[in-house]
Amino acid sequence: TSAPADGNLLPEGAHMAIIGIGLDLIELSRMERSLHRFGEHFLNRIMADDERSAIPGDPASPSARAVSHVAARFAAKEAAVKALGTGFAEGIGPRDVAVRSLPSGKPELVLSGKAREKADALGVKKLHLTLTHTRDNAAAVVILEGYPPHH
């Protein structure tokens, strides 16, 4: 079969397509320096209230576990805006991309504001997120899936 003139290879009722992929890697030492230097001000700028309350221990004197927690979630935010194709621009800020943990512990992305608007405009229906960290780095991969709009 041939592709339709608009280039959309997904006929009606077909499976969703990958709309965007984002990857980000953060050095834990850089995140630790930011947390020590800017503390609560930094956390308030990059995380929603419920994200901050999920940080293990005392954010004022972050443990290695807290640093990796924050770094992985900030990497998720960066990966998400890369997948959207915007970066932190077009009115999208770090608080517009939240990372929540399901009861199973699996992380999920929740978009709001301009990030949600951009995702809707792109036809995003499903967001996939995976986080990982080593002794030195935290990383996140985001895949956006959906039905791209017809042009």
Residue ranges and their predicted role:
Residues 9-151:
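Core catalytic alpha/beta fold that binds nucleotide/phospho-ligands
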